[in-house]
């Protein structure tokens, strides 16, 4: 009985928290990713005008994920969510070749912000199930990720609807959090 109590206490005390900001251009799949992680299922989404926030429990870490709308008119509001962000998830529609430069500009603009200087960067190269999707290496090149010399970053190929790659991304974030201590 004491062992059960000890394990429970250890799990309660040992739980870590990580504040995650998930952004990207509109229709990249941010909300679908959030609810696939939270509920394990696909939900019908509409364009996010404000934000969605959910807590995702994974590997004894409580990820508080802020999913903020990506339409161009509301992107200036992203900066209001920067404070205390430990991890940034930037979601890219791997099939949207026409807007990948726009995605790069938005990402670089954000990464220049002082409030995000210590945040680690996880890029989800989403929609990998589509036949014309750019692979992770191509997205890495087009986003200029190799130029990020002083920031921990990782790119993960994902498919939000199937869940492929999502937990691998969370694994990387979890390891980053553990290494910060």
From Swiss-Prot:
UniProt keyword annotation of Mitochondrion present: no
PROSITE patterns associated with the record: ARF (PS51417)
Sites of N-myristoyl glycine lipidation: 2
Annotated compartments: Golgi apparatus; Cytoplasm, Perinuclear region
Binding site for GTP: 24-31, 67-71, 126-129
Major location category of this protein: Golgi
Molecular function terms from GO: GTP binding; GTPase activity
Record keywords: Cytoplasm, ER-Golgi transport, Golgi apparatus, GTP-binding, Lipoprotein, Myristate, Nucleotide-binding, Protein transport, Transport
Oligomer status and interactors: Interacts with PRKCABP. Interacts with PI4KB and NCS1/FREQ at the Golgi complex.
Task performed by this protein: GTP-binding protein that functions as an allosteric activator of the cholera toxin catalytic subunit, an ADP-ribosyltransferase. Involved in protein trafficking; may modulate vesicle budding and uncoating within the Golgi apparatus.
Name of this chain's protein: ADP-ribosylation factor 3
Source species of the chain: Homo sapiens (Human)
Lineage: Eukaryota, Metazoa, Chordata, Craniata, Vertebrata
């Amino acid at each position: 009985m004491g062992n059960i109590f000890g394990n429970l206490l250890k799990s309660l005390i040992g739980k870590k928290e990580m504040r995650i900001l998930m952004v990207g251009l509109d229709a990249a799949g941010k909300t679908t990713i959030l609810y696939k992680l939270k509920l394990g299922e696909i939900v019908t989404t509409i364009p996010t005008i404000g934000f969605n926030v959910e807590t995702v429990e994974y590997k004894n870490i409580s990820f508080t994920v802020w999913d903020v709308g990506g339409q161009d008119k509301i992107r200036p509001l992203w900066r209001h969510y920067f404070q205390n962000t430990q991890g940034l998830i930037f979601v890219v529609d791997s099939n949207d070749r026409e807007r990948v430069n726009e995605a790069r500009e938005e990402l670089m603009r954000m990464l220049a912000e002082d409030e995000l200087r210590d945040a680690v960067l996880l890029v989800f190269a989403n929609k990998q199930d589509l036949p014309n999707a750019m692979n992770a290496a191509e997205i890495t090149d087009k986003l200029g990720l190799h130029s990020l010399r002083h920031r921990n970053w990782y790119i993960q190929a994902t498919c939000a609807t199937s869940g492929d790659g999502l937990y691998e991304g969370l694994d990387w974030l979890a390891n980053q959090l553990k290494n910060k201590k």
